[in-house]
Amino acid sequence: MVHPVQVGKRTRMSFAKVKDVAEMPNLIEIQLDSYKWFLDAGLYEVFDDINPISNFTGNLVLEFVGYTLDMDNIKYSVEECKERDTTYAAPLKVAVRLQNKETGEIKEQEVFMGDFPLMTEQGTFIINGAERVIVSQLVRSPGVYYNYNVDKTGKKLFSATVIPNRGAWLEYETDSNDVIYVRIDKTRKLPISILGRAMGFGSDQELLEYFGEEERFKATIEKDNTKTKEEALLEIYKRLRPGEPPTVDSAISLIDSLFFDAKRYDLSRVGRYKFNKKLAIGLRIANQIAAEDIVDKLTGEVLVAKGEKISRANAEEIQNRGINSVDVLVEDRVIRIIGNHFVDIHKCVDFDISDLNIRELVHYPTLREILDNYSDEETIKEEIKKNMTRLIPKHIIKDDIFATISYQIGLAYNIGYVDDIDHLGNRRLRSVGELLQNQFRIGLSRMERVVKERMTIQDQEAITPQQLINIRPVAAAIKEFFGSSQLSQFMDQTNPLSELTHKRRLSALGPGGLSRERAGFEVRDVHHSHYGRMCPIETPEGPNIGLINSLATYAKVNEYGFIETPYRVVDKSEGRVTGEIRYFTADEEDQYLVAQANEPLDENGCFIDKKVTVRDKGEVLVVPSKDVDLMDVSPRQLVSVATAMIPFLENDDASRALMGSNMQRQAVPLLKPYAPIVGTGIEYKAAVDSGVLPKAKNAGEVVYVSANEVRVKRELDGGVDTYRLLKFKRSNQGTCINQRPIVAKGDWVLKGEVLADGPSTDLGEIALGKNIRMGFITWEGYNYEDAMLISEELVREDVFTSIHIEEYECEARDTKLGPEEITRDIPNVSEDALKDIDERGIIRIGAEVRSGDILVGKVTPKGETELTAEERLLRAIFGEKAREVRDTSLRVPHGEAGIIVDVKVFTRENGDDLSPGVNELVRCYIAQKRKISVGDKMAGRHGNKGVISRVLPEEDMPFLPDGRPLQICLNPLGVPSRMNIGQVLEVHLGWAASALGWHIATPVFDGATETDIEDCLEKAGYNRNGKTVLRDGRTGEEFDNEVTVGIMYILKLAHLVDDKIHARSTGPYSLVTQQPLGGKAQFGGQRFGEMEVWALEAYGAAHTLQEILTVKSDDVVGRVKTYEAIVKGENIPEPGVPESFKVLIKELQALCLDVKVLNDNNQEVKFKELAEDDDEIEVLEVNMEGTEDSTTEEAKEEKGEAYIPAEEIDEEIDYENIDLLDFTSDLDIEDDFN
C-alpha cells in the first residue's frame, strides 16, 4: 500500500510495489567516464600507434614518451570563459625523444601541443564561450556480418562483409551457381579461391585439403582461372591497381599493406573481440556430430569420439587445446569447420598470469611458439608482454580470413547463423572519448607527414624535436571537431531536463554514421535488444525519428562501447532471485529467459506463481518458474529519464507519450517553481545529476548563507568551502538561470547534498510546471481544437510568468576610413533618445528600453569624397573635427523590449582577447518578464498540448461547490481519441493528494492502481468517481452533468507568442525577384503562394489578386507610386509589370529565345524602368527598391520614417540594337575553326 519515501528534503507518498534493488547509475557518467578514459588511456593509445616516427633512411627516430595536461596553468575558470568568449582548456605538453642513430645522440624535450578543451564537471565543454555537448554516436561495430538473399528459385544465397574500424573491406557473396566470390575494398569480384591461393595455398589440392571437399568450394575452384600462388597474386594486383605493371613483389607488398599493416588496417579492440566471438571454433562446433575422432595433437588424448555429439564444454576445451579444424557430419555430409586459432590464454598456461591483465583471446600459434621455446614462468611472462601485439593483433590475420571463408561455406549447412545488423550487439557507441581520439589521430597523422618532411630537409646535427613538430594540424583537427562537427552540439539549456537528456542522447547520424536519406525503416524501428538500453519512446518526430535516441535509465556503456543493462541473477536450483546484479550486453542477454521486475516474490525471493511471464529475445512466453534465468531490476529500466517522469505512462498511447517526453524538454523555467504533486519519484535524481544544482563537495556545517553564496565549514579539516550561486544568468536558449539557497545557517550537510535550487527545481526536485486546478469541460467553444481557457488569476498571480534574457553585442572595428568609435555624440539624434545613455555612449543598467531605442552609440567614418580647395583649407585650419561620420548605433530590434540587467565592456587596453580588427566590444543583456497570454503554448506531461484561446476573468470561470473557481478548462474530447488516459488518472490522484496535503510518487509501470486512486479520493472526502458538480461563474447555475475536476501538472512551453508575432512594414526585398524576404528574422512578408492564388481565383476577386501580385509584391515602380498615393491621400494608380515577370523574360532570352511582350495590337511593349521615374521618387525621399541586406538601418529610424534600404538602379541594356563590335573589339577572332 502507499508508504512514505524521503526524496531529498521532501517526503513523498509512494505507490511503488517493487523495491529498488539496484542504485541508478550517475546519469551523465557516459560523458564523464568516456572523457576520463580518453585522458588516462585514449591519448596514450594514439601516441603509441604513431610511435616511432623515423625518416626514410631510418637514422633519425622521433618518439612520444609521455604527456601531461597542465592543470595549474588553466587561463580562465569556466565562468570567466563564458564571459570572455574563450575556450575552457588546459595546455597539453608532450615529452618527445629524438634519437640520431648515426651519432647515437638523444635529445629530449617537452613540446607544447596546443590547448586541449577540458570537460566541465557537468559533462559539457566551453568552446568560444558557448556551452556545448558531444553527443554519443551509434555506429555499426567492426566485425564479420553474414546475411542472405533469396534468389528466383527460392535458394538462399549467403553473403558476408568483413568490416574493420579503418581499412579495406572484404565482401563475400554467392551466386546462384554456388560460386563464392570475394570483393576486396569495393573492387570487382574474384572467385574466393584466388584469395586462398594468394594467402599461401597455391594448388587446388592444397586448397581442398585445407578447406575440405565441399561442392561449393569445388565449383569456385573450377571457375578460378589461376592455378598457382603467383598467378593469384598477380590477378588480385590487376584488380586493385589496374593500369600498373603487375609483379609478384608489388602484389605481396600491396596485400601486406592492405590487410596486415597495423597502421593501414585497424580492427580496434572491439573488432578483435567481435571477430573472436563470431569465428572461434568453440561456439560453431557445439551441438554438432563429430565426423572423426577429435584428438589433442600434443597429448594424443581423444576429446570426442567419432559419431558423438560435441557438447558445449567439449567444444570449449577443443578450442583451448589449439585444435583449429574439425570435421562434422551434417545430413551424411562431412563439413570442415575452421576456426581463427584464438584461445583463452588462462586455459593454456598452467601458472597464474592474472597480473598481465589479458582479457581477450590470444593467437594460439604465437603462444605455442613462446611456450615451446621457454620454460620458466618469468621468461614466459616477459615474452608474452613483448609479443602482445602478435598475440592480440589489432589487424586481421590469415587465420581470420580462412575462418571467415569457412563460416561462409558452413552457413549453407546451417552451421552458424546470420546476423541482424540492427541488433544492439552489433551496434556500438562512440562516446566523447573515442570521437576525440579519432580526431586526435587524424591530426597526429597529418603532423607525422610534416615531421618526416622536415627530417629530410633540415640539418640532422642541429635539429631539435621542437623544430620538427608542427602542432597546427593537431590543434586544427581538435578545433574543427569541437567547432563544427555534427556531433558537437550547442547545448539545449531550456531547463535541467533538456540539459540532462542532451548529454544522454544517442545519434546514428554524423561522420561515419548513417544519413537521413539513406536510413530505412528497419534502422529506425524499435528492436527487442533496445530493452533496458535505449528508450523505445523518446525520439524526435519528423525526419530524424528513430535515428536519435535516448539512453535508458539504468543503462551503462562497457569498455567495448556496447550498451549494457542490469539484471538480477536467478539461482535456478532453488528458483530464488539472488541479490547479485550483473550487467549484460544485448548479445549476452539473448541466451536467457528474463522475468519482469513486478513478478511477485515471497520474502525469501522465490517466485510465488508456478508460471512466470518471461521475455525470450523478442517473444513473450509463459514458462515454469524453475526455467527463469534473470529478472529485471526495476520497472522503469526500459525507458529514458524524460519518459520515466510521466506518471501513469502505462495508461498512455505510445505516440502521445513520445510527445509528452519531448515537450517536457521544452518547458520554460518559471518564476516560482513548484514540484509536481503527482510525481514518479525520479525527479530528485534527475535534477541532482543534471548539473544545475550546487552540491556539497564535502560534509560539514553551513556557516554563511546569502543570495549570492553559501559557505560550508568542512568536517574533516575545518576549512571553508565557498559556493558562488549564479544570479539571473542567460542560458543558451535565453531562459533565466537563477540559483536560490535552500539550506540555512547552522544546517549540517552531507557530501553530495543539494545546497541551492536552480532553474526549474524545487527542493532539489525537477519542477518544470505548476499544479493547476482544472476541469474537463467545454466553455463557449473556447476549447475547440485543443485550445485552453485560463483564468485571469494565473496572469495576476504570476503563476506562469517566466524571465527571458537576450544578449546584444556591438563591436567597434577598424575600417579602411578609420576606426569606429563608441560615443554619446551621435549625429542627428535628439537628447531625449539619449536620456539613458551614459557619457561613454552605453546604456545604463536598469533602464527600460523599447524597440528602436539606442543601446550603444557608435559612429563610423564616412567615405571621403574629393575635397575642394576651400574644404581643404577649412580642414587645415579647424583640424579633423569636420570629418563626416554616420550613425551605426546598436538598437533594440523590432518587437523586443525589456530592462537592461547587465552591460559588459571588453577593450584592447584592458588586455581582453578580442578578434582581429575589433577595438572594443560591448554586450548588453535585456531581461523581459513574460506573463502567460493568449497564443502561448502549454502542455501536460501526457502529450496533451494546446494553445491559450482566452483569458477569462476569475469570476466568470466555472466554480466548485466550495466557491473555488477553476484555473484552466480543457476539452474533454482531447482524451478518448488520443488514448492518453494517464492524464485523467493524474487529475484524480492529484485532486485527492492536494486535499490530503501529500506529494505523491507513482513510478512508471508500478504506480497507483484504479482502486488505490479511489481509496485516496474517499480518504480526502471526495466522490469515488472523481467527479464534482460545477456551477457556471456567470449565472451561478449548475452544469447539466458532473465534471471531472482535479489537479494537473501543466507546463508552459518555449513557443511563446511574443517570439512568433510579427508584422512587416516596409522592409528588405530580394535582390533578383524584388519580392519581400520571408521570416521574422529578415523582417519579411507573408508568402501568398500558389494555393492562395487559386483561392482568390475561385472567388473571382480579380482586383485583389492583381494588387497582391503587383504593388504588394514586386512591381517596383508601382509600389513607390502606391506609397506616394497613400501618403498624399490620392487614388491608387494602375499597377505596372512585376519584376519577376521581367526576370522570367530575361531568363528565356538568356536561353537564346527571342521573347517579346506584345499588346492587343501586336505591338511590342517596352517596359518602363525605374531610372525614368527617379525625379518623382526623389521628392518623396523614400525608396521602395530594396536590397537583401537588412543591416543598414540608418538615421531614418529616428525620424520615425519606415526603414527603406539603399537604392539600386540597374543600367538597362538595349538587347535588340546591340552593336556586336562592342564585344569583338578586344578579341582576336580567327577564321579557321577546324
Swiss-Prot record:
Name of the top EC class for this enzyme: transferase
Disulfide bonds: none
InterPro entries: DNA-dir_RNA_pol_bsu_ext_1_sf, DNA-dir_RNA_pol_bsu_external_1, DNA-dir_RNA_pol_su2, DNA-dir_RNAP_su2_dom, DNA-dir_RNAP_su2_hyb_sf, RNA_pol_bsu_bac, RNA_pol_bsu_CS, RNA_pol_bsu_protrusion
Biological process, per Gene Ontology: DNA-templated transcription
Keywords: DNA-directed RNA polymerase, Nucleotidyltransferase, Transcription, Transferase
GO molecular function terms noted in the UniProt entry: DNA binding; DNA-directed RNA polymerase activity; ribonucleoside binding
Catalyzed reactions per annotation: RNA(n) + a ribonucleoside 5'-triphosphate = RNA(n+1) + diphosphate
GO cellular component: DNA-directed RNA polymerase complex
EC code: 2.7.7.6
Gene3D superfamilies associated with the record: 2.40.50.100, 2.40.50.150, 3.90.1100.10, DNA-directed RNA polymerase, beta subunit, external 1 domain, DNA-directed RNA polymerase, subunit 2, domain 6, RNA polymerase alpha subunit dimerisation domain, RNA polymerase Rpb2, domain 2
Transferase found in the keyword field: yes
Pfam families on file: RNA_pol_Rpb2_1 (PF04563), RNA_pol_Rpb2_2 (PF04561), RNA_pol_Rpb2_3 (PF04565), RNA_pol_Rpb2_45 (PF10385), RNA_pol_Rpb2_6 (PF00562), RNA_pol_Rpb2_7 (PF04560)
Function: DNA-dependent RNA polymerase catalyzes the transcription of DNA into RNA using the four ribonucleoside triphosphates as substrates.
HAMAP family (alphabetical): RNApol_bact_RpoB (MF_01321)
NCBIfam families registered for this protein in UniProt: PRK00405.1, rpoB
Subunit structure, interactors included: The RNAP catalytic core consists of 2 alpha, 1 beta, 1 beta' and 1 omega subunit. When a sigma factor is associated with the core the holoenzyme is formed, which can initiate transcription.
The family this protein is said to belong to: Belongs to the RNA polymerase beta chain family.
Official protein name in the record: DNA-directed RNA polymerase subunit beta
Protein's organism: Clostridium perfringens (strain SM101 / Type A)
Gene (name only): rpoB
